[in-house]
């Protein structure tokens, strides 16, 4: 009797990602998985757990905490790491934070550079990681669309889009010199819809902010910003209104816009994704604070 070994498209994506994760574990001395607490990170963490099951994942998680994340994100992070036995490293730029750096006072560009990019680079140098997994996907944004799965970084952690290595089929070049590193994107070929379908298939826990509910938001420059704590400037507080919203992407709460939605279950989110025509990155303020914003940030060492 002939067996049918044809995989569904989700299982094909899963197999590719697991292969990439295992390849990194085999090729590099000290890898780390960057954990943003979002839906893509949650899928990536599940794939890592499956890649080495029933053994322990041979690398830690590292979260770059800007001190402006949604409170529900931090609660979810701590609970998930504890329940699943992950070695969780949390890095923050406390010098900048104690100096009062924030998105409202310094703007998105300065805040992102000091609280996210510089904190990330410090963490990578501190622990001497030579490979860092990220949850970026090519369908998210144009600069990410042209980046390799194994993305080379020089000894300053900088990315040069004109100096990328060829990737033929599933052959990856892990050769680096001392001080250089590789950013690895095992979800490169996934779409936002794939992510949600896989979350449904695997019953992966995610931050409740992804589900629609009544939340206090204020319209700031066309973005529905949730009033997550008392650091919202006084000038915006009298404009707060309750709307049924959810988040398609998560980051620092003053820089992440919500979308009006009734999708309060995974099934409804999947249905919503079937008809959407805009990337989730359109709600991220940091992607539009300068021309070619994301590419420039990546050149400087951003995720």
Swiss-Prot record:
Q: What class of enzyme is it?
A: transferase
Biological process (GO), any one: hydrogen sulfide biosynthetic process
- Source organism superkingdom: Bacteria
Q: Which CDD domains match?
A: Sulfate_adenylyltransferase_2
Q: Which reaction does it catalyse?
A: sulfate + ATP + H(+) = adenosine 5'-phosphosulfate + diphosphate
GO MF entries: ATP binding; sulfate adenylyltransferase (ATP) activity
| Presence of keyword Nucleotidyltransferase | yes
Task: Please name the pathway.
Answer: Sulfur metabolism; hydrogen sulfide biosynthesis; sulfite from sulfate: step 1/3
The record's EC number reads: 2.7.7.4
Entry keyword set: ATP-binding, Nucleotide-binding, Nucleotidyltransferase, Transferase
Disulphide connectivity of cysteines = none
Q: What does this gene product do?
A: With CysN forms the ATP sulfurylase (ATPS) that catalyzes the adenylation of sulfate producing adenosine 5'-phosphosulfate (APS) and diphosphate, the first enzymatic step in sulfur assimilation pathway. APS synthesis involves the formation of a high-energy phosphoric-sulfuric acid anhydride bond driven by GTP hydrolysis by CysN coupled to ATP hydrolysis by CysD.
Tell me which family the UniProt entry assigns to this protein.
Belongs to the PAPS reductase family. CysD subfamily.
Quaternary data = Heterodimer composed of CysD, the smaller subunit, and CysN.
Name recorded for this polypeptide? Sulfate adenylyltransferase subunit 2
Q: Which organism is it from?
A: Phocaeicola vulgatus (strain ATCC 8482 / DSM 1447 / JCM 5826 / CCUG 4940 / NBRC 14291 / NCTC 11154) (Bacteroides vulgatus)
């Amino acid at each position: 009797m002939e067996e049918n070994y044809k995989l569904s498209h989700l299982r094909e994506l899963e197999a590719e990602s697991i292969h990439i994760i295992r390849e990194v574990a085999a090729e590099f001395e000290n890898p780390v998985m960057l954990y943003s607490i979002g839906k893509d990170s949650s899928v990536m963490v599940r794939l890592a757990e499956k890649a080495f099951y029933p053994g322990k994942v041979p690398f830690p998680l590292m979260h770059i905490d800007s001190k402006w994340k949604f409170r529900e994100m931090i609660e979810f992070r701590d609970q998930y790491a504890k329940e699943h036995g992950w070695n969780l490293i949390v890095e923050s730029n406390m010098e900048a934070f104690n100096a009062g750096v924030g998105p409202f006072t310094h703007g998105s560009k300065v805040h992102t550079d000091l609280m996210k990019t510089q904190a990330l680079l410090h963490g990578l140098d501190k622990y001497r990681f030579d490979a860092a997994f990220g949850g970026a996907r090519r369908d998210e944004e144009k600069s990410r669309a042209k980046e390799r799965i194994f993305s080379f970084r020089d000894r300053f952690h900088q990315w040069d889009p004109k100096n990328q290595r060829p990737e033929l089929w599933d052959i990856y070049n892990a050769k680096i010199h001392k001080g250089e590193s590789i950013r690895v994107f095992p979800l490169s070929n996934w779409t936002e819809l794939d992510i949600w379908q896989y979350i449904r298939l695997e019953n992966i826990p995610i931050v409740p902010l992804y589900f629609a509910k009544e939340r206090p938001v204020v319209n700031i420059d066309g973005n529905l910003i949730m009033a997550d704590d008392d650091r919202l400037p006084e000038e915006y507080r009298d404009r707060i209104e309750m709307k049924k919203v959810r988040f398609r992407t998560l980051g620092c709460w003053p820089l992440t816009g919500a979308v009006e939605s009734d999708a309060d279950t995974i099934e409804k989110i999947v249905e919503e994704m079937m008809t959407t025509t805009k990337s989730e990155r359109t709600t991220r303020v940091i992607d539009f604070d300068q021309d070619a914003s994301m590419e420039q940030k990546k050149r400087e060492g951003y995720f």
